[in-house]
A protein has these predicted regions:
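Flexible, glycine- and charge-enriched loops at secondary-structure boundaries
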Residues: 194
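Intrinsically disordered, low-complexity regions enriched in acidic/Ser/Thr/Pro/Gln residues
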Residues: 4, 8-185, 190-191
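Feature captures the catalytic cores and cofactor-binding loops of soluble hydro-lyases/lyases
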Residues: 197-277
């Protein structure tokens, strides 16, 4: 059980027009910036571009990582990242989570003393943007992981793709951003966006942990590539199905086959490719 304090956290409210528990917030002014330029005809035009700001994550007194993020859910990103990297344990007693907007820092404090110097030396840069770091024992954590077999209907995939594509989002507003959606059946539940696809996954991981949501009957939908990093995080979150409109990497497919994860890519309209599961 987590015991956390959050400051300044504002969640989206479910509306009559969608079924999301948390939905994108494209209307938040601090997430985009108006920039003026010229188009191909030379005409002056103003467009919105996504903000990108650093967020440094501390665990107790130790600096862990600096991530580039849009800054909408800093506490969720920090806790989800630490959880997915194995730095926060199941049932961890988290005494406080403090976010300083001016310093762009989140400090997570636990009752347990922590020291991850050895772990930090084993980190591996991945193909992910913004953070792109996997620690060695995160991959070791996959040993013995076999995901549950779950029913999956093609109609769910078609419904999810259509619903997600028409949801108002920062991607539709400004582009240059990734989206990740936690789904159940044909219903999208939590939709997170960020400049790094793994950031969006980490935010969802934090939500699942706080709400005690089991991943065994869930589907993860992402706009990003199906890389090893994405597959590892999905597997460690206990989610047996990972879907993307984008393509695969060989290592991602190999790990998915190892843990029994259903991996579906190139999801466009009613076309897709399944390489594992």
């Amino acid at each position: 059980m987590l015991n956390c304090r959050f400051g300044g956290m504002q969640l989206s409210v479910k509306t009559d027009t969608d079924a999301y528990l948390i939905a994108p917030q494209p209307g938040l002014a601090r997430l985009t910036r108006a920039v003026t330029g010229r188009d191909q005809t030379g005409a002056e035009t103003t467009i919105n571009v996504v903000e990108e700001r650093p967020l440094t994550i501390y665990l107790n007194a130790q600096e862990i990582v600096t991530a580039m993020t849009i800054g909408d859910y800093p506490e969720y990103l920090a806790l989800g990242f630490l959880r997915n990297q194995g730095m926060l344990r199941d049932g961890e007693d988290i005494t406080s989570v403090d976010y300083d907007e001016e310093l762009e820092v989140v400090v997570v404090r636990t009752a347990r003393k922590t020291d991850y110097e050895d772990k930090m030396r084993k980190k591996t840069r991945t193909s992910g943007c913004a953070v792109g770091t996997v620690f060695g024992d995160m991959m070791e954590g996959l040993e013995g992981v076999i995901l549950p077999t779950t029913a999956l209907r093609t109609s769910w995939l078609y419904d999810l793709s259509a619903q997600i594509n028409r949801t108002p989002s920062l991607y539709l507003e400004a582009g240059a951003i990734h989206g990740t959606v936690l789904c159940q059946g044909n219903r999208p539940l939590v939709y997170m966006e960020d400049v790094g696809r793994h950031n969006a996954v980490d935010k969802i991981a934090r939500w699942m942990l706080s709400e005690k949501v089991d991943g065994g009957d869930k589907i993860m939908y992402t706009t990003g590539r199906l890389t090893a990093e994405m597959v590892i995080k999905c597997a460690l979150m206990g989610i047996p199905v990972l879907v993307s409109r984008s393509g695969f990497t060989a290592w991602g497919v190999e790990i998915a086959q190892q843990v029994g994860l259903t991996l579906i890519g190139r999801m466009r309209g009613k076309r897709f490719m399944c390489l594992s599961g």
